[in-house]
Amino acid sequence: MTSLADLPVDVSPRHEGERIRSGDMYVELAGPKSFGAELFKVVDPDEIEPDKVEVIGPDIDEMEEGGRYPFAIYVKAAGEELEEDVEGVLERRIHEFCNYVEGFMHLNQRDQIWCRVSKNVTEKGFRLEHLGIALRELYKEEFGNVIDSVEVTIMTDEEKVEEFLEYARRVYKKRDERAKGLSEEDVNEFYVCLMCQSFAPTHVCVITPDRPSLCGSITWHDAKAAYKIDPEGPIFPIEKGECLDPEAGEYEGVNEAVKEHSQGTVERVYLHSCLEYPHTSCGCFQAVVFYIPEVDGFGIVDREYPGETPIGLPFSTMAGEASGGEQQPGFVGVSYGYMESDKFLQYDGGWERVVWMPKALKERMKHAIPDELYDKIATEEDATTVEELREFLEKVEHPVVERWAEEEEEEEEKAPEEEAPAEEPTMEVKELPIAPGGGLNVKIVLKNAKIYAEKVIIKRADREDKS
C-alpha cells in the first residue's frame, strides 16, 4: 500500500475529536494502564530508509480483544530545510494526524500517549501498518516543502518500547533544556496554539517563554519554528501588547487573542494564576493544580498518579474539572515545563502556596522546588485527607500556616461587628470552588458571595425521603 486511498479506513480531518469508549474499543495502546511514547527526529538522509513503514511487535490482528499493550511511534524525517528546532512541533502533529484516522483515538503527548482502536475498524481490516502509512503520507502532504523523506516505525514489543521510552525521555530533556533562557519581558510576540480545539473548541493555548504549552510539547522556540515552516497552521504569533499586570501575567494582546479565538467565551486570562482568570485547558495537560480552601494552598497531581488526592478526587476527576476550554477558578492544567518556570503561579504565591504533591512528582520536580520548601510539601505518605494535611503543614511550619494566622487576626478584628444582634455569622467569598469527595457529582462555585447561615446541608435528591 502506497497511498491513503489504499487503506481500509478513511483518513480525514473530519474524524478529529472522535472518542472511542471502552465498550467500542478493540484494544488500548499505551495509556495509564500500560506505557509508551512518541518521537519525531530530524536525521541526515543517509540515516533514513525513505517511505519505510515497520511494525515491531504484534499487530492488531495478533492482539486480544480488550487487551492493553505498550505502544510507541517513531517518525524520522530528512530534508535540506529541516532543522532540529522543529522536532517538538512536528512531533505534536502526530496527535493531530493519528486522529485523522477513522477508528483510531490518540490522546496526550510524549511519554503520556493514550490510544485506542475501535472494534468497527478492526473488522474492516485496520492494522498498525495502516496507521504508519497514514502518518507517512500526511507528513509528506502537509510538509512537503521541507520534508524530503519519511520513515515510520511503530512498536508494540514490550522490550523494544521500554528501550525506546528511555531514549525518547533523553531527547525530551535535551529539548526542554534548550528552551530555557528567555523570559516574557525579552520578547514582543507570544504564540497561540489551536491544535486541540477539535476536543475543546474554546481552548486557546498561549505559549510564552515562561509558559510552555499545557501538553509540554511546545516551547516558545518550538512555536516560532512551527510558524516558520507552516504559517497557515494551528500555531501562530500574537502581539503580547501592553502588560496590564506583570505579576498575574495579564497582557492586552493575550486577552484580545483569547477572546477572538474562543468565540468570545473567554475574555481575560491571568497566565500565572490558578484562582483568578486561569488559563483554559483542553485535557492534554501533564498535571493539574488544584486549590485546597481548608489550608489556603495548592495541590498538584499529574496523570501518572493513580490514587486520590487529599480532597478525595483522583487526577481523572480533576482533569474533567480543568478541561473543556472553560475557565475553572481553583483548577488549572499545567506542564512540567511550566512548573520549572520562575513565574510559576507567581500571582498566587508560587511554590510557597504548594502544599501537596504525589511523591513521584515531587521527586521529579525537585530541581524546581526551592530547597527550603521541599521537605515542607506533603505527599501521599504524609497526608491522604485534608485533616492530615493541615496537621502536617503545622508540624513542618509551612509558609501557608502564616496565612492562617493572618486570616484569624482579620476575623478577630471583625468580631465586634459580627456580635451585633442584627448580624448572623458571615462568610464572604470572592470566588471559591468546592469539589466534594465521596463520588458526589456536584460542584459549587461561589462568586462574590456573602452567606448568612448557621448550617448548610447539601443532600442528593435520590437519597431524600419521597414520602
From Swiss-Prot:
<feature type="binding site">
    <location>
        <position position="282"/>
    </location>
    <ligand>
        <name>[Ni-Fe-S] cluster</name>
    </ligand>
</feature>
<dbReference type="GO" id="GO:0005506">
    <property type="term" value="F:iron ion binding"/>
</dbReference>
<keyword id="KW-0411">Iron-sulfur</keyword>
<comment type="function">
    <text>Part of a complex that catalyzes the reversible cleavage of acetyl-CoA, allowing autotrophic growth from CO(2). The alpha-epsilon complex generates CO from CO(2), while the beta subunit (this protein) combines the CO with CoA and a methyl group to form acetyl-CoA. The methyl group, which is incorporated into acetyl-CoA, is transferred to the beta subunit by a corrinoid iron-sulfur protein (the gamma-delta complex).</text>
</comment>
<dbReference type="Pfam" id="PF19436">
    <property type="entry name" value="ACS_CODH_B_C"/>
</dbReference>
<dbReference type="InterPro" id="IPR011254">
    <property type="entry name" value="Prismane-like_sf"/>
</dbReference>
<dbReference type="GO" id="GO:0043885">
    <property type="term" value="F:anaerobic carbon-monoxide dehydrogenase activity"/>
</dbReference>
<keyword id="KW-0808">Transferase</keyword>
<feature type="binding site">
    <location>
        <position position="284"/>
    </location>
    <ligand>
        <name>[Ni-Fe-S] cluster</name>
    </ligand>
</feature>
<feature type="binding site">
    <location>
        <position position="196"/>
    </location>
    <ligand>
        <name>[Ni-Fe-S] cluster</name>
    </ligand>
</feature>
<dbReference type="InterPro" id="IPR038571">
    <property type="entry name" value="CO_DH/Ac-CoA_synth_bsu_3_sf"/>
</dbReference>
<keyword id="KW-0408">Iron</keyword>
<dbReference type="Pfam" id="PF03598">
    <property type="entry name" value="CdhC"/>
</dbReference>
<dbReference type="GO" id="GO:0016407">
    <property type="term" value="F:acetyltransferase activity"/>
</dbReference>
<dbReference type="GO" id="GO:0006084">
    <property type="term" value="P:acetyl-CoA metabolic process"/>
</dbReference>
<feature type="region of interest" description="Disordered">
    <location>
        <begin position="403"/>
        <end position="428"/>
    </location>
</feature>
<comment type="similarity">
    <text>Belongs to the CdhC family.</text>
</comment>
<feature type="binding site">
    <location>
        <position position="193"/>
    </location>
    <ligand>
        <name>[Ni-Fe-S] cluster</name>
    </ligand>
</feature>
<dbReference type="GO" id="GO:0016151">
    <property type="term" value="F:nickel cation binding"/>
</dbReference>
<dbReference type="GO" id="GO:0051536">
    <property type="term" value="F:iron-sulfur cluster binding"/>
</dbReference>
<comment type="subunit">
    <text>Monomer. The ACDS complex is made up of alpha, epsilon, beta, gamma and delta chains with a probable stoichiometry of (alpha(2)epsilon(2))(4)-beta(8)-(gamma(1)delta(1))(8).</text>
</comment>
<dbReference type="InterPro" id="IPR023432">
    <property type="entry name" value="CO_DH/Ac-CoA_synth_bsu_arc"/>
</dbReference>
<keyword id="KW-0533">Nickel</keyword>
<dbReference type="InterPro" id="IPR045822">
    <property type="entry name" value="ACS_CODH_B_C"/>
</dbReference>
<keyword id="KW-0479">Metal-binding</keyword>
<feature type="compositionally biased region" description="Acidic residues">
    <location>
        <begin position="405"/>
        <end position="426"/>
    </location>
</feature>
<protein>
    <recommendedName>
        <fullName>Acetyl-CoA decarbonylase/synthase complex subunit beta</fullName>
        <ecNumber>2.3.1.169</ecNumber>
    </recommendedName>
</protein>
<keyword id="KW-0012">Acyltransferase</keyword>
<dbReference type="InterPro" id="IPR004461">
    <property type="entry name" value="CO_DH/Ac-CoA_synth_bsu"/>
</dbReference>
<dbReference type="GO" id="GO:0043884">
    <property type="term" value="F:CO-methylating acetyl-CoA synthase activity"/>
</dbReference>
